[in-house]
Amino acid sequence: FGSWEYTVLDEAYDQVDYLSLHQYYGNASGDTADFLASSKGMDDFISGVVSICDAVKAKKHGKKQINLSFDEWNVWYHSNEQDKKLEKWVQAPHQLEDVYNFEDALLVGSMLITLLRHADRVKIACMAQLVNVIAPIMTSDTGAWRQTIFYPYMLTSVFGRGTVLNTQVLTPIYLSLIHISEPTRH
């Protein structure tokens, strides 16, 4: 990680205003603690890319700040095994139609907080897919419904406006096998 971003920025710094990021998180192991700690992975990813942008800026004695566009992010794993069973070349099969649970909503909320916490550099953030395919809204012949991940997204879109305040509460260490644990700030 990082060498591609550094190389591209080193060559094209003057032409770049935003660096695009994509990230999806899943819970294939069924470990709630590790899954919910994925927002720490997102936080580290953003911080790492910001450091790369700033390193290239310093090397070039640049004036402009390169910001981030988190073009694609979401929770995606529920439909993986089901989609592997699809026949090839079938016309418009239902696929990637994850049905989300409360755990997923908690992670989406944490990811949104992470994006807000980095609002100084993440200027654009787009949840990947909004209807049917890994989406907060599902449709069928009989209507539409909101999934669990809809609610943190909706609440953030309504209340996450204006100036982002860096308020933090220090909590005990959160044990996770995937993401290095440190005192967690919420």
Language-model features and meaning:
Residues 1-112, 171-177:
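Noncatalytic carbohydrate-binding groove/subsite architecture in carbohydrate-active enzymes
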Residues 16, 65, 122, 150, ...:
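Active-site lining segments that contact anionic ligands and/or coordinate catalytic metals
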